[in-house]
Regions:
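Alpha-helical transmembrane segments and terminal signal-anchor/GPI-anchor hydrophobic tails
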Residues: 167, 178-186, 193-268, 272-300
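Surface-exposed cleft-lining segments at the edges of enzyme active sites
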Residues: 121-130, 165-177, 227
């Protein structure tokens, strides 16, 4: 029963986010071509679960819907818009696909292009799916927060079955990147509900342990059988409390501090690394792919830190002159 400690997951949440983004980068850049790096897409599931888990603490302090949405948008929109604008200009220069009309620009900058126009030439690219998905989840988070744990479990079960159905029949397969993460986001809210009654409810804690071990078994069986897709994500989702609790021991000392620092830059790092241009530029100079990946990641961390400072200063400046929007 002591294998899983939700309090440690909360304490190490920022460091876990740092570990997750490094895992995602290793996946996208094919670092070392190892089996661990090939599973790095699961780092996104860690993001989603820890995001919903953390959002509940924010909602517990202030559950006003408008205030919550504005806080989330202020965190994401400035950085997101700045970086996709830079890529927008680069795509024009390199004569790549890019939005042309005002309507296309609107769907691109709002994220609606991912949901409704992802098959169009001007739609959001598949590797840009994460932010539109996360923003959509944020809009539903306050409603999930108000549900009790029984209703959340019913919703979780329904979402898992819907995901399996959509995945099995390959319905909108490109959007599977988003809809496969719906159960993960719901499960993060459930973990928060368990966290708040962790000491007084032994039944919930026992169920959490059993579901985590069952999820770990499903995860490894799915990997060994080459099933992939939904089975791997669902298995990993239930196994995450166990996985993160075991990883907590890695967070002691300097490593934990480094990962926590990186964890504060996950938004910037994610947006910067997905375009591959930095890696291509470094590889032309260095040659060796794995060394280039390490150098590129370090450079991305530095640039992400600079971007975060610039954006925060800009937002603060806008607030001081009476800007009350995003």
């Amino acid at each position: 029963m002591n294998f899983i400690n939700l309090r440690n997951i909360q304490k190490g949440r920022t460091a876990f986010m740092g570990l997750a983004i490094l895992w995602v980068i290793a996946f996208h850049y094919s670092f070392l071509q190892s089996e661990i790096s090939k599973m790095g897409y699961l780092g996104v599931d860690i993001f989603i679960l820890l995001s919903s888990f953390g959002l509940c603490f924010s909602l517990n302090r202030n559950n006003n819907y408008k205030d919550f949405i504005i806080r989330r948008l202020k965190r994401i929109i400035p950085t997101w818009w700045m970086l996709i604008t830079i890529m927008f200009v680069i795509n024009i220069i390199l004569q790549r696909n890019h939005p042309h009309s005002l309507f296309q620009i609107f769907t691109y900058y709002s994220g609606l292009g991912w949901w409704f126009f992802h098959n169009e030439p001007f739609g959001i690219y598949y590797y840009e799916w994460y932010i539109p998905t996360l923003l959509t989840f944020y809009f539903f988070a306050p409603f999930l927060f108000r549900l009790n744990i029984k209703k959340l479990y019913l919703l979780l079960i329904a979402s898992v079955f819907c995901t399996i159905y959509l995945d099995y029949y390959s319905i909108e397969p490109r959007l599977s990147l988003s809809y496969q993460r719906i159960p993960v986001f719901i499960y993060g809210v459930i973990l928060y509900k368990m966290y708040t009654c962790e000491v007084c409810n032994k039944t919930l804690k026992s169920f959490l342990c059993l579901s985590s071990f069952a999820g770990a078994i499903l995860f490894f069986v799915a990997l060994m059988c080459g099933i992939g897709g939904c089975a791997v994500i669902v298995g990993f989702m239930f196994a995450m409390p166990l996985f993160l609790s075991l990883c907590y021991k890695l967070l002691y000392g300097k490593l934990g501090k480094v990962l926590s620092f990186i964890g504060t830059l996950t938004l910037e790092l994610y947006l910067l690394h997905i375009y591959n241009l930095p890696l291509v530029a470094v590889m032309r100079c260095v040659g060796n792919r794995n060394i280039s990946i390490i150098i590129t990641t370090i450079l991305l961390i530095v640039v992400s830190y600079v971007v975060s400072i610039v954006v925060n200063k800009a937002v603060e400046k806008l607030n001081t002159i009476g800007y009350k929007g995003l």
